[in-house]
Amino acid sequence: MKRIVLLRLGHRPERDKRITTHVGLTARMLGAEGMLLASDDSGIVQSLEDVVRRWGGNFYIKNNVSFKQEIRNWKEGGGKVCHLSMYGVNLPDLADELKKCDKLMIVVGAEKVPPEIYQLADWNVAVGSQPHSEVAAVAITMDRIAEGEPLEKEFPGAELTIVPAERGKHVIENAGE
Amino acid sequence: MKRIVLLRLGHRPERDKRITTHVGLTARMLGAEGMLLASDDSGIVQSLEDVVRRWGGNFYIKNNVSFKQEIRNWKEGGGKVCHLSMYGVNLPDLADELKKCDKLMIVVGAEKVPPEIYQLADWNVAVGSQPHSEVAAVAITMDRIAEGEPLEKEFPGAELTIVPAERGKHVIENAGE
């Protein structure tokens, strides 16, 4: 099975708290195995771990990583690195190649990223060459390169499960073990 | 041509500033004609209008609308209304129907939405029945129902244009008129 991990660069505690949380939720929902946070923010870790506890699956969050070390390890393990921004090669021209990759690190920055990321990445990918939401970039990229239907993925071990409904909210509390 | 407008509910100035800006950027990038903001926040309007001025196109932002009035007007004009949340019918089961619709309002809330939106919407759509980023929900929905390749859309009248590049940033400043 394809492995995808997300690396979040340039996160500033407080200012980027909600955007980074949305990046993490999006990556989890679309099948990433975890998120590496290249900043120190235990609040992000807690809020995403709380989601995993209640909604299931095995998504992990690693706080305060060295991005260079993580990229080096990933590449040494045979992985590829794809950096999403508004400046790279447009996603439609690379999606087929990314889709073939079975071990992919997706890197997204906040407003500023360390310039060396453009060299460290195997691919610099633009998700449209327009002002950019990193949440949307992760969403569109992962949706387009997913195996099967990512929106039907199940998350084992959930305390809560939503039953799709035409009107209103239908949530099941699963019995504990 | 298909018309799509985005309606943003439940925006709280300050707390939701960046998420709502990302919702607007995403809607613009993927071809919405504008965003209706059902809260009063002129800062959002300014920052998105600034993007439009520099990066082109005709995306508009309407501040402090009445959501009920806007939905009523839209429906009277023959439009349909699709509310994205984590509770509705899963997107893969509705995307074909949404794609056929040539005048679509996409509604996204923040943490809380007025309950009547579930009744006012023609469709309540879940983008995966998992904890939810409204930015990702807009991105995936608009990408899946787009006509043609939304990431190759051009934005006329831009001061700045990005040239896709394998490494680094390549931005052209267009000559004024």
Curated annotation (Swiss-Prot), chains A, B:
It is found in: Cytoplasm. Its main location: cytoplasm. One of its GO terms (molecular function) is tRNA (cytidine(56)-2'-O)-methyltransferase activity. One of its GO terms (cellular component) is cytoplasm. It catalyses: cytidine(56) in tRNA + S-adenosyl-L-methionine = 2'-O-methylcytidine(56) in tRNA + S-adenosyl-L-homocysteine + H(+). The keyword S-adenosyl-L-methionine applies. InterPro entries: Alpha/beta_knot_MTases, tRNA_m1G_MTases_N, tRNA_mtfrase_aTrm56. Pfam families: Trm56. Its EC number is 2.1.1.206. Keywords: Cytoplasm, Methyltransferase, S-adenosyl-L-methionine, Transferase, tRNA processing. GO terms for biological process: tRNA nucleoside ribose methylation. S-adenosyl-L-methionine binds at L84, G109, A110, E111, K112, V113. Belongs to the aTrm56 family. Specifically catalyzes the AdoMet-dependent 2'-O-ribose methylation of cytidine at position 56 in tRNAs. Homodimer. PANTHER family: TRNA (CYTIDINE(56)-2'-O)-METHYLTRANSFERASE. HAMAP family: tRNA_methyltr_aTrm56. This is tRNA (cytidine(56)-2'-O)-methyltransferase. It comes from Methanosarcina mazei (strain ATCC BAA-159 / DSM 3647 / Goe1 / Go1 / JCM 11833 / OCM 88).
